[in-house]
Design a protein with these regions (language model features):
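Sec-dependent signal peptide recognition
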Residues: 2-10
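C-terminal motif of bacterial Sec signal peptides marking the signal peptidase cleavage site
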Residues: 15-19
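Bacterial signal peptide processing site
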Residues: 21-23
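Short, compositionally biased low-complexity segments enriched in polar/charged residues
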Residues: 45-74, 86-90, 112, 117-120
Length: 149
């Protein structure tokens, strides 16, 4: 009986530790999050679906959603869900490079857009990388939190 109780307690401990595992590595629905951002966040221009692969080199096995402004603003959404953190890190570097080049261009011709690019919501959530260029950053962060926990 004493052995059984020891085994039972050990199993309960393992299960409770597993419940505290890294939830940030859970797969994020890139299309769902991208669509939710496009629909719920306030943008100054109409957002249209684009092919993320036209702007970023996407790793094999990743899924992506991307939207860009139809107007003269630099508002955009990129959501890329990768198969592992190594791929997510590479995507984040590529997104940062894209963002930096856009900022540099905007500083010359659209200073107000450079400011918006500078305050973009940009981060890695486990294996998902999100970039949302908008003035409505509070809503964007809330929507992202719903999807990534």
């Amino acid at each position: 009986m004493k052995r059984f109780m020891t085994l039972l307690l050990a199993m309960l401990m393992v299960l409770s530790l597993a419940a505290c595992g890294d939830k940030s590595s859970a797969t994020v629905d890139a299309e769902g999050l991208g669509k939710a951002l496009a629909e719920r966040v306030q943008f100054d221009s109409t957002m249209s679906i684009i092919d993320a692969g036209d702007y970023l080199e996407l790793p094999e096995g990743s899924s992506a959603a991307a939207f860009m402004s139809d107007g003269s603003t630099m508002e955009e959404i990129f959501v890329v869900s990768c198969k592992d953190k190594t791929d997510a890190s590479a995507v984040k570097i590529a997104m940062q490079s894209l963002l930096d080049s856009q900022k540099q261009e905007a500083e010359r011709y659209q200073p107000e857009e450079a400011e918006r690019l500078g305050s973009a919501v940009f981060g890695t959530y486990g294996t998902c990388v999100v970039l949302c260029v908008t003035s409505d950053t509070d809503t964007a962060n809330a929507v992202i939190k719903e999807y990534v926990g």
